[in-house]
Regions:
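Flexible, solvent-exposed loop/hinge segments and secondary-structure transition points
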Residues: 1-91, 95-111
Length: 111
């Protein structure tokens, strides 16, 4: 469930949502910025403490999400490339971002 104290609406109508997913053993905290059209503006990995898989923080990998909406698949190995050495982290973050976008579409888009 999303926590209200981790969801912000900006003055220009964009949203910032902070969420967590399980990596391999530890939680990954990330933020999704969504513009007023429902498009992802950016993804930021805020906390990653796993021993391996730090490639998840790679800017080039995160750029794949920019422009995606809730109507896009946002699925690993479909429209999002996987990361060798960070497979579980990449899958869980990708699935989490898809969940954030579904939440935005259902609960925030009309606000």
């Amino acid at each position: 469930p999303f926590k209200g104290d981790r969801i912000w609406k900006t003055e220009n109508g964009s949203w910032i949502i902070v969420d967590e997913v399980l990596g391999k053993h530890e939680m990954i905290t990330y933020a999704v910025a969504i513009n007023s059209k429902g498009e992802i503006l950016g993804i930021e990995i805020m906390e990653y403490v796993e021993s391996y898989g730090y490639e998840i923080k790679n800017k080039e990998w995160r750029k794949q999400f920019i422009g995606k909406t809730a109507n896009h698949p946002i699925k690993l190995n479909q429209d999002i490339q996987n990361i060798s050495g960070a497979t579980l982290s990449a899958k869980h973050v990708t699935d989490g971002i898809k969940r954030v976008m579904a939440f935005y579409d259902l609960a925030l888009k009309s606000q």
